[in-house]
């Protein structure tokens, strides 16, 4: 068993001051580490409650034992303002009280590098760290639309800033951005609720000869179409789209939806190209890795896996397979089935399941139907459904050696994937020919899961 994993970490970064943290990873076969949310924790009266529900690693839990339960995130670096000249987006600052511990952390990173660990930065949706939303011209901090070219310029400047102060880092993981892909109302990733019509989005559409408002209207019309189904319509759709050419008539009858996908592909690509070329212009040897969603709905999220090899060094599709909460694969599939059923009460269960399979390009194992998704998945799910997603990744990216899927146990409080499922997942990954993955994240790893991960490491 010889997978080469990347371990992604979250706060507290303070645990990294202890060489035992790095030694533990090395002993477990982890020689690549991506440090996400690179912030110090400051105890406050009202702030983020930590540790989170998902933390399980003893080293993480012990850090919080003699502390309060609310914290403020403090960026670990003070910015070099000259790097941000000309930008209306401004970086956060660090107070002087953290100067000493920053020096200690920098030394710890250097020792880790000397131990043979490769270190990677992490950017989450182009705001770089959880406390680092860039401030706009009014001083307010918050998410900025990635169709604003300055968002990429800010990311490039932030990357240079970190590398200047922490030169032992050799690459960066870009997490997103993504357009939405869910259909369940009220979900974070509900594609029908995502209707950004800012000037940057409208300008991007006009540059393609498109009217953004017409695309948004087409999305609303498609939702209405999904709410007016019957068994005869579904049977006809399944019959007429069975072959490769069969779907052509459907797409030609929905030209604005095809234009919407083109818009999503183009704007995500333009943003990632700006990131990639901007970083490489200043740091040509720096490795740039970029995430996407799993192939079944990567098109909805705006990522064209075959094209991305031109503007990423490694591709990191998210193989998030849990069932209990967003953005797990089984959770999304269940939402499609349940939402289509709620919208169309007269539809048979058979029609709903078959339609979901056709839309997402999946087939449920006979021994693990949708009704069982809340329980642990059998090996057949990982061999068939997860295995197909992996095979799609390999085919679409065209280079298995540049493929590093994300895997995780859960997100936002849902039931975790069980240790045996992790074993089935890693075995399927290995059997597919994929030899690397990135694990999200260190803090959630129980001893039973740790044993499984180390079984498969080099």
Model-predicted regions and their roles:
Residues 45-73, 127-146, 174-247, 309, ...:
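Aromatic- and acidic-residue-enriched segments that line the glycan-binding/catalytic groove
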Residues 175, 205, 215-257, 303-376, ...:
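Aromatic- and acid-rich polysaccharide-binding/catalytic face
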Residues 4-15, 80-102, 138-153, 254-269, ...:
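The substrate-binding groove and active-site-proximal loops of carbohydrate-active enzymes
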Residues 118-128, 173-177, 208-243, 259-301, ...:
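Aromatic-lined carbohydrate-recognition surfaces of secreted/lumenal glycan-active proteins
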Residues 70-167, 181-213, 269-273:
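Active-site-adjacent "subsite" loops/lids of carbohydrate-active enzymes
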Residues 131-139, 181-183, 285-329, 414-432:
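Substrate-binding cleft/loops of secretory-pathway carbohydrate-active enzymes
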Residues 17-43, 51, 55-82, 164-171, ...:
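Catalytic domains of carbohydrate-active enzymes, especially glycoside hydrolases
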Residues 129-132, 244-257, 286-295, 347-381, ...:
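Active-site clefts of carbohydrate-active enzymes
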């Amino acid at each position: 068993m010889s997978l080469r994993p990347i371990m992604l970490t979250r706060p507290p970064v303070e645990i990294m001051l202890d060489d035992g943290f790095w030694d533990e990873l090395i002993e477990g076969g982890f020689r690549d580490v991506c440090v996400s949310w690179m912030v110090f924790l400051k105890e406050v009266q009202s702030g983020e409650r930590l540790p989170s529900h998902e933390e399980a690693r003893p080293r993480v839990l012990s850090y919080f034992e003699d502390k309060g339960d609310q914290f403020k995130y403090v960026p670990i670096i003070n910015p070099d303002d000259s790097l941000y000249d000309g930008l209306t987006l401004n970086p956060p600052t660090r107070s002087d009280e953290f100067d000493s511990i920053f020096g200690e952390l920098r030394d710890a990173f250097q020792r880790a590098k000397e131990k043979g660990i490769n270190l990677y930065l992490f950017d989450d949706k182009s705001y770089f760290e959880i406390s680092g939303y860039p401030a706009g011209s009014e001083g307010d901090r918050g998410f900025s639309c990635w169709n604003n070219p300055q968002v990429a310029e800010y990311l490039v400047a932030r990357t240079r800033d970190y590398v200047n102060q922490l030169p032992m880092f050799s690459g960066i993981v870009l997490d997103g951005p993504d357009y939405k892909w869910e259909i369940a109302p009220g979900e974070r990733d509900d594609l029908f609720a995502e209707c950004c019509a800012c000037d940057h989005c409208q300008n991007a559409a006009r540059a393609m000869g498109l009217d953004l408002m017409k695309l948004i209207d087409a999305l609303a019309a498609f939702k209405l179409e999904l709410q007016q189904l019957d068994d005869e319509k579904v049977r006809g759709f399944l019959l007429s789209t069975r072959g490769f050419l069969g779907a052509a008539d459907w797409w030609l009858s929905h030209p604005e939806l095809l234009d919407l996908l083109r818009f999503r592909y183009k704007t995500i690509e333009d943003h990632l190209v700006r990131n990639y070329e901007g970083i490489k212009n200043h740091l040509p040897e720096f490795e740039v890795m970029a995430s996407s969603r799993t192939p079944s709905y990567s098109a909805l999220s705006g990522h064209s896996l075959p094209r991305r090899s031109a503007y990423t060094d490694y591709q990191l599709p998210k193989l998030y397979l849990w069932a209990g909460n967003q953005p797990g694969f089984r959770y999304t599939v269940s939402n499609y089935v349940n939402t289509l059923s709620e919208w169309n009460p007269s539809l048979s269960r058979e029609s709903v399941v078959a339609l979901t399979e056709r839309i997402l390009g999946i087939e449920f194992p006979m021994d693990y139907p949708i009704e069982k998704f809340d329980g642990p998945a059998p090996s057949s799910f990982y061999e068939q459904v997860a295995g197909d997603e992996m095979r799609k990744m390999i085919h679409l990216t065209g280079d298995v050696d540049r493929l590093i899927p994300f895997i995780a146990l859960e997100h936002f409080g849902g039931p975790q994937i069980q240790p045996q499922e992790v074993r089935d997942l890693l075995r399927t990954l290995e059997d597919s020919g994929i030899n690397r993955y990135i694990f999200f994240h260190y803090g959630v790893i129980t001893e039973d899961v740790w044993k499984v991960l180390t079984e498969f490491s080099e």
